[in-house]
């Protein structure tokens, strides 16, 4: 929880603010903190949930999809299959009907046929 005098992190770690740090806080909200000097602190998912007093949401679970693109590879329209390497598979965070979210930030949009554009 982020308060006016310090922070209690989700892992239990405590941080006490100095008088100057405490005086610099302008507003504490659900997603972060705005300081009088114009800087801000953006909460990550766990910190925002902790600050709001809600338990963290579970990470998405991989599930089998009825489409040609999945976590382990792709079935191409010509009938050939391409198996992903372990690194390529690990880079896929979430695969859905309209695209894939990757850990390296290069998200993939799918066509109506479920193939990468």
From Swiss-Prot:
Pfam families xref list: Cuticle_1
Report the superkingdom from the record.
Eukaryota
* Expression by tissue: Calcified shell.
Keyword annotations of the record: Cuticle, Repeat
Question: InterPro entries, from UniProt?
Answer: Cuticle_1
Keyword Repeat: yes or no? yes
Any one Gene Ontology MF annotation carried by this entry is: structural constituent of cuticle
Instruction: Tell me the ranges holding the sequence repeats.
Output: 1-17, 26-43, 67-84, 93-110
Q: Does the keyword Lyase apply?
A: no
Q: Report what the protein is called.
A: Cuticle protein CP1243
